[in-house]
Structure formats: structure tokens, C-alpha cells
Amino acid sequence: MSLQAIIEAAFERRAEITPKTVDAETRAAIEEVIEGLDSGKYRVAEKIDGEWVTHQWLKKAVLLSFRINDNQIIDGAETKYYDKVALKFADYTEERFAQEGFRVVPSATVRKGAYISKNCVLMPSYVNIGAYVGEGTMVDTWATVGSCAQIGKNVHLSGGVGIGGVLEPLQANPTIIGDNCFIGARSEVVEGVIVEDGCVISMGVFIGQSTRIYDRETGEIHYGRVPAGSVVVSGSLPSKCGKYSLYCAVIVKKVDAKTLGKVGINELLRTIEE
């Protein structure tokens, strides 16, 4: 059986799988997928012919990984943890950090099965299993990258940003942030929403699948997708009865030179000398 076939078959009988009952073939397949996600060999979602495609079997492997492992003690800097998923950097040496070429500030936490690309900076933040963080991206203080979320190249996730995962509540597709995006402080993008390349999301914007994304220039309303190059702020739209207003996200304009100047990436913070 192929790796995918083993995972698909195991997922159908997931309720029966425990750390004591899992067979060797299934355990090996799940662990191979987690290692592949950890190294960047596999991605839960990727862009193919201009469209984002989710590889559901990889997401299923992530979910199955919680069925095959018992909780265990995990050593931290000043404390201990008790969890089923190991920490990504538990066995990293100085040489391996230098080779992979990203910076990790104290208190940043990355779970095994997440991939961090070269020239990334992880401030005290959290990156969950199955996530992919693209080259040159900054994950700022208290930002959270949810399970299986896909973060593009040269992205800035500002302080306190939340990028939703797929594990709980269970989501069909991961949340995706395209290349060269800026996500403002304390904003939340969840429920498999796709923010296309080159967008700027202002501070305190919340976007889920049911959030209306209103383009003030065209009057068009989008759901679940922010078009490429959009500048988005929080706002509201009137109800049909006109008695109250409901929250929405507003596309106020397309990214221009002035906007880029305000949110430009500081290469001095990214590049690690080889």
C-alpha cells in the first residue's frame, strides 16, 4: 500500500486506534508524514496552477498522530510540559540552527511537524503541528500559527495575530496567508480563509468564512477570500431592516507605494549570515 493509502485506511478506523493497539505499519506511516511535514517535504496545502489545493490525507495523518502517542514529560527552559506532541527544536544543535538559517527568540514554541523556512524570525510565538512558515517571514510576539496553516514568503504576522488551525473546531481546509502579506496586530484570520498575495490587513480585523469582505470601490462582497493586493480594515454594513449594523471587513483600496512604505520588511532582521 502507498503511504497515502495507509493513512486513508487508518483514518477510517481512527476510533479503534490507541497507542497500545496501533500496528507498526500505521505508526510508521504517520511518523513518516510528520517527519515530512517537519522537514518541508510535504505541505498540507500548496498552490497548483494558481489554485490552492489541500492534501486531505496529510491533514488526516496529523489528526491520527494524536491517537498513537501517550502524553510524556517535555522539558522547557524553566519548567516541564506534558503532551502528546514533541517540540520541534528539542534535539537541535547550534550547528543545525545555523544550517537551517532561522532565528528563534526565547519562549517561542514550535511543535514537531511544523516547517520553518530560511531567514524566518520567531519572536515569542506559537507554531502548531502541520503548519508551514515561508522564507523570510516574521512571526511577532504572541502571534499564533494554527495547525496546518500555510504562511507564505516575506509575511509579517504582527503582535498577537491569530491564524486559525484545522484541529479544533475541525476545519475542512487550512487557513492560508499568501506571499508578501502584512497582518496587523491582534487580527484573526480563521476557518480556512485565504488571504491572497500582497494583502495588507489592518490592526484588529477579524475574518472567518461568514465574515462579509466588502469592496467599497466595486460594491462586491467576498466570503472566505481576500483578493490579492487588498488593503483591509474593520468596518460595518447596515442590516436589511436598517435598524442596526453588523461587523464586516472593508477593502478600502489596493496596495500602493505609500502602503508598502509603511509595512515594508526590514531585511536586516531576517538575513542570517552563512
From Swiss-Prot:
Broadest EC class?
transferase
- Reactions it catalyzes: (S)-2,3,4,5-tetrahydrodipicolinate + succinyl-CoA + H2O = (S)-2-succinylamino-6-oxoheptanedioate + CoA
Kindly give the InterPro entries that the UniProt entry links to this protein: DapD_Trfase_Hexpep_rpt_fam, Hexapep, Hexapep_transf_CS, THP_succinylTrfase_dom1, THP_succinylTrfase_N_sf, Trimer_LpxA-like_sf
- Cellular component annotations (GO), alphabetically ordered: cytoplasm
Major location (coarse): cytoplasm
Q: Where does substrate bind?
A: R103, D140
- EC number(s) per entry: 2.3.1.117
State where the protein is found: Cytoplasm
Would the keyword Amino-acid biosynthesis turn up in this protein's UniProt record?
yes
Q: Which NCBIfam families match?
A: dapD (TIGR00965), PRK11830.1 (NF008808)
Q: In which pathway does it act?
A: Amino-acid biosynthesis; L-lysine biosynthesis via DAP pathway; LL-2,6-diaminopimelate from (S)-tetrahydrodipicolinate (succinylase route): step 1/3
Q: By its UniProt entry, which SUPFAM superfamilies does this protein fall under?
A: Trimeric LpxA-like enzymes (SSF51161)
Source species: Actinobacillus pleuropneumoniae serotype 5b (strain L20)
| HAMAP family associated with the record | DapD
Subunit structure, as described in the record: Homotrimer.
Q: Which UniProt keywords apply?
A: Acyltransferase, Amino-acid biosynthesis, Cytoplasm, Diaminopimelate biosynthesis, Lysine biosynthesis, Repeat, Transferase
Q: Which GO terms describe its molecular function?
A: 2,3,4,5-tetrahydropyridine-2,6-dicarboxylate N-succinyltransferase activity; nucleotidyltransferase activity
Name of the protein in question: 2,3,4,5-tetrahydropyridine-2,6-dicarboxylate N-succinyltransferase
Biological process terms from the Gene Ontology for this record are: diaminopimelate biosynthetic process; lysine biosynthetic process via diaminopimelate
Question: What family does this belong to?
Answer: Belongs to the transferase hexapeptide repeat family.
